[in-house]
Each structure stands twice: as C-alpha cells, then as structure tokens.
C-alpha cells in the first residue's frame, strides 16, 4: 500500500491575497510592490501628512536607528528635508502608490494608472485580538481624467461583493484622511451588523503633485484596508495573532 502524503495548505492570508488580486485583475488593475523599509518622505510627506502629525510618534511607528538617513530627492514647502530622509518601516502600503506614479511619470508614461498594492506593514502598538505589530494591507489607486466618487463606489462594491458574496450591503460615510479629499469610510453589513472595512476617497491634489501628476489635468481615487481583518470577518477567526503563531491546526483548515 502506498503511503498517503499530507498535502500542503496555503496560509489564509496568502489565499486571500490571491483572491483579491484575481478580483482586481478582472477590473484591469495591475499589481504593484515596493520596499518595506521606506523614507519618511514616501511614508508621510508625499502623502500630505504633516511633520507634526501624531502618526509619526515613536509609539505608532518603527523608526530605524542605523542608517540615520535614507535617500530623498525632495524638499517641498515648509517640510524639513533632512527629516524626510529618515528611514522607517512602512506603516501602510500607500508609499508604493507614490513610487509607482513617480516612476511612470519619469518614463514619460502618463495616466491612466490602475494598481492595487497588497503587502506587509508595521505599527508600533500593543498587540491584542485585533491589533498586531505587523499585518497585511491592501491599497488601491486609479488615476485618469475625470475620475469621480462614482468610479470609487462602483469599484469597491464590485470588490466587496466578489470577496464576501453578493448578498452584502455597503454604505459610505464622510470621513477624513490627509491624502484624500473628499474622504469616506466604507461600511459593510455582515451578519446583521454594520462594520467598517475600508477607508477611501479622491486623491488630494498635493499627493498627485508630489508624484509628478498635474492635479488640474488628472484626478484619482485611493482606498485601503487591512487584509487580515477581511479574512477574520470572512472565516470567523477571532484573533489576528493566530495568523502569525505558526500553528498548523489553523492553516490545515484552509
């Protein structure tokens, strides 16, 4: 009798990233990646986050002691250029948007741009059932002429209904993010409760300018969410830390 070999399993986060990529590829989005070790410019300055914003505090961000400075070519307005060179573990995947657009503009390739960015991010915060020092985030970007909130709404509804099922309800609420204006939180009705699942909005003109795009000619939308949180909702996994403790009893269920 032949030995029956145990088959391997994809980690639920890896499976979710494959599914998310497939959904957005249906809409014509490309997949983009970028460095996890960033400069303060790309992680904060280029995204219109003030240099005195609390998100930059030591208790929220992992700063790198050595090297003390990274590579940064810009100094905009009242921003301190030396500060902008400081290296940091990226706190979100939004810096990839700036790098992607900047690179395309350098090559003379003008919009439209449609990308999604799944990747690992880092936050200097206490861990509990819903918070981890590292987790996976999804970022999305679409830049073209006359991009509107209607494009944003249609894209996110398509994504969430494909990922969770066509029966879900979705609503948009006004909110604030430094890099979008106007901004909206996206809630999903899941098992009878409204839950916040995404942040989104039309790209702030300052962010377009920082990437080399003329905000008078082009507009765009951006959105972001935690992939771990989406997987927790979809699978019923109650604790984000379970994704990272290496317990095969979790992975083997998928």
For each of these PLM feature ranges, what is it?
Residues 2-254:
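TRNA-recognition modules of translation machinery and tRNA-sensing kinases, especially anticodon-binding
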């Amino acid at each position: 009798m032949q030995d029956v070999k145990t088959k391997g399993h994809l980690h639920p986060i890896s499976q979710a990233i494959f599914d998310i990529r497939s959904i957005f590829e249906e809409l014509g989005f490309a997949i983009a990646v970028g460095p996890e070790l960033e400069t303060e410019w790309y992680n904060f300055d280029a995204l219109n986050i003030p240099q005195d914003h609390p998100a930059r505090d030591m208790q929220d961000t992992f700063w790198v002691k050595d090297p003390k400075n990274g590579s940064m070519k810009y100094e905009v307005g009242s921003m301190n250029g030396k500060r902008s060179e400081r290296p940091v573990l990226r706190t979100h995947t939004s810096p990839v948007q700036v790098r992607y657009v900047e690179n395309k503009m350098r090559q003379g390739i003008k919009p439209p741009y449609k990308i999604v960015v799944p990747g690992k991010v880092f936050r200097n915060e206490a861990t509990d059932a819903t918070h981890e020092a590292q987790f996976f985030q999804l970022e999305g970007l679409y830049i073209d002429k006359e991009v509107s909130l209607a494009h944003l709404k249609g894209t996110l509804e398509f994504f969430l209904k494909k990922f969770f099922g066509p029966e879900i309800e979705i609503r948009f609420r006004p909110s604030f993010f430094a890099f979008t204006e106007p901004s909206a939180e996206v809630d999903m009705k899941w098992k009878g409760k409204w839950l916040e699942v995404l942040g989104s909005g039309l790209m702030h003109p300052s962010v377009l300018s920082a990437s080399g795009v003329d905000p008078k000619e082009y507009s765009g939308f951006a959105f972001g969410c935690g992939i771990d949180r989406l997987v927790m909702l979809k699978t019923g996994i109650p604790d984000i830390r379970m994704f990272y403790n290496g317990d095969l009893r979790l992975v083997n269920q998928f």
